[in-house]
């Protein structure tokens, strides 16, 4: 036991009480600092993840979509210029690509699967499967500073970045070692579904499933949408 000369017991108890009080304060402060640091770290990680998701879903500064059945098959930039909107005055680079309709529906593509769509996707089964040529896809990827994808004649790929249909597209790719589009039979080029964004719609709902085919195959297909891609 330690005795301090010149200090009475009351004073010693006061010192001990103050030390215990300060220890509790320091403990609480350290706990709060730990919680704050963790919260900031989690918040920063979440923000970075959301920013990355947003960037992947919106790879262009602008895209203008034109429904061919309504607007006709036209040059979008020329149409805008004729209406006093000259995109080239503002844009660093532009590309126009086209999306076609296959001669099959998504229900035919998903044949043999037990599918359950979200309410927003109730019209998907009866919709024609979207098709894009490999050249147009690579033009879109170049706008995003991405490397081109190689596809040989007689081959096809599937692209999808929408959670509501991704698993069905992945299963369809596995069950279709070959597929016929526009009267041309194509062999599966890869076993993995691509997850690229070639046009922008709403975040998380860019592509419910698109066939990527050689340029020659699209010649016999009906064009559905033209898209002007713009980077400022």
List PLM regions with ranges:
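Feature of multi-pass inner-membrane transport and sensor proteins
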Residues: 1-30, 36-40, 44, 48-59
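Nucleotide-cofactor and metal-assisted catalytic machinery
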Residues: 52-232
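Short, flexible loop/turn elements at secondary-structure junctions
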Residues: 16-19, 35, 66-68, 232
């Amino acid at each position: 036991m330690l005795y301090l000369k010149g200090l009475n017991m009351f004073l010693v108890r006061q010192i001990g009480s103050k030390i215990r009080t300060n220890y509790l304060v320091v403990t609480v402060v350290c706990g709060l600092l730990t919680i704050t640091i963790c919260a900031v770290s989690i918040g920063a990680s979440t923000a970075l993840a959301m920013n990355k998701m947003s960037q992947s879903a919106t790879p262009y500064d602008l895209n203008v979509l034109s429904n061919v059945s309504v607007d006709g098959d036209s040059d979008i930039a020329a149409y805008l210029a004729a209406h006093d909107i000259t995109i080239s005055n503002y844009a660093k680079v532009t590309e126009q690509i086209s999306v076609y309709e296959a001669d099959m529906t998504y229900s035919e593509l998903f044949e043999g699967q037990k599918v359950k769509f979200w309410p927003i996707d109730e019209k998907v089964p009866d919709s024609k499967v979207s098709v894009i040529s490999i050249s147009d896809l690579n033009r879109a990827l170049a706008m995003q500073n991405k490397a081109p994808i190689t596809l040989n004649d007689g081959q096809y790929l599937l692209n999808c970045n929408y959670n509501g249909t991704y698993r069905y597209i992945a299963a369809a790719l596995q069950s279709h070692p070959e597929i016929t589009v526009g009267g041309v039979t194509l062999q599966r080029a890869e076993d993995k579904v691509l997850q690229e964004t070639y046009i922008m719609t709403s975040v998380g709902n860019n592509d419910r499933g698109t066939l990527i085919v050689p340029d020659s195959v699209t010649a016999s297909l009906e064009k559905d949408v033209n898209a002007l891609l713009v980077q400022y």
